[in-house]
Amino acid sequence: MSVSFENKETNRGVLTFTISQDQIKPELDRVFKSVKKSLNVPGFRKGHLPRPIFDKKFGEESLYQDVMNALLPNAYEAAVKEAGLEVVAQPKIDVTSMEKGQDWVITAEVVTKPEVKLGDYKNLEVSVDVEKEVTDADVEERIERERNNLAELVIKEAAAENGDTVVIDFVGSIDGVEFDGGKGENFSLGLGSGQFIPGFEDQLVGHSAGETVDVIVTFPEDYQAEDLAGKEAKFVTTIHEVKAKEVPALDDELAKDIDEEVETLADLKEKYRKELATAKEEAYKDAVEGAAIDTAVENAEIVELPEEMIHEEVHRSVNEFLGNLQRQGINPDMYFQITGTTQEDLHNQYQAEAESRTKTNLVIEAVAKAEGFDASEEEIQKEVEQLAADYNMEVAQVQNLLSADMLKHDITIKKAVELITSTATVK
């Protein structure tokens, strides 16, 4: 194989390589044997057409495209490796010569990984706005949240207040004409929940069961139903019931109702304190890691980040998001319909963070390379076993899904992140 690379501009160039006749001839034989099985040529049994007759009747060249399709992927990968390139986007391939009896010549316009000039990435000073200490207020807030979850709704005679639930019938109209979706019966509405159009819930505060209220609201300009957007509507609303939350007493019985593993309120508080301490410690570590990596990225210089890398990152993020939806049993088309968004909106959303994420990945990879980090066979095996345990998969399944190179890359990245983080100090 002959390989050459010519730089055209920063992070871009043309890779030229050949596929030799030593590779082409056996592949031609294989393709011919496959093709002749389906050929019907007068005078010959199906599948028994001699090669010279085929070449005379159809031409050896008729097999070239199938041969090229079979050989090109591996030939391109080998050329990239021999040229010592790190390609970061799909190449633009052009077959420049496929002459009979000669090596085939291919060119590929490629985008290469940009140069990263590292600044300081060890012993960084960072600031984080995350508290490690667990306060009594933190514990009480957690218990109060669980206590409210156990609250019961009881009918009250007094007027409705924010936080109450009202059971209502309503009929909506615009200029005296009812509209689709504007009617409901025995609907439970939490006042202050924001379930309804802004202003609707506020107008029920201060009213009691048995009252009928004319609620006047204006649909938001960006309302999903375009025929209603920006229009004023009247909802004739009848209140059937007003219900208030009744929370249980703060005692040992409540503690046992919240968590059957504890006996007293004091036990529950101690358990929550430990859980919150663990969660806060993790949040603190994550904040330090994020701040340290952000600082390392700020200290580095990336020479002309290619747009193609950002596009690849957006594409990867969108596919990951849509894949997660499908794994949860959510049809992407249904998601877009419900949220009133499009796939283009999703691309635009990820576009904003793709450049930052791409820069971060490049800097971490550069740190791993600068430090000479590698991964041993033992480390790779340990990573496979951990992934299998995390995702409830067989070890063999993980090995089939992830190549050794991918696993090695992930391990070296983790080592780089650990180095940046562990040497950082918090101001």
Swiss-Prot record:
GO terms for cellular component: cytoplasm. It is found in: Cytoplasm. Keywords: Cell cycle, Cell division, Chaperone, Cytoplasm, Isomerase, Rotamase. It comes from Streptococcus pneumoniae (strain 70585). The keyword Mitochondrion does not apply. Consists of 3 domains; the N-terminus binds the ribosome, the middle domain has PPIase activity, while the C-terminus has intrinsic chaperone activity on its own. The keyword Cytoplasm applies. It catalyses: [protein]-peptidylproline (omega=180) = [protein]-peptidylproline (omega=0). Its main location: cytoplasm. It holds the Pfam family Trigger_N. GO terms for biological process: 'de novo' cotranslational protein folding; cell division; chaperone-mediated protein folding; protein transport; protein unfolding. GO terms for molecular function: peptidyl-prolyl cis-trans isomerase activity; protein folding chaperone; ribosome binding. Disulfide bonds: none annotated. Belongs to the FKBP-type PPIase family. Tig subfamily. Its EC number is 5.2.1.8. Residues 163-248 form the PPIase FKBP-type domain. Involved in protein export. Acts as a chaperone by maintaining the newly synthesized protein in an open conformation. Functions as a peptidyl-prolyl cis-trans isomerase. The lineage of its organism: Bacteria, Bacillati, Bacillota, Bacilli, Lactobacillales. The gene is tig. This is Trigger factor. It is an enzyme of class 5 (isomerase).
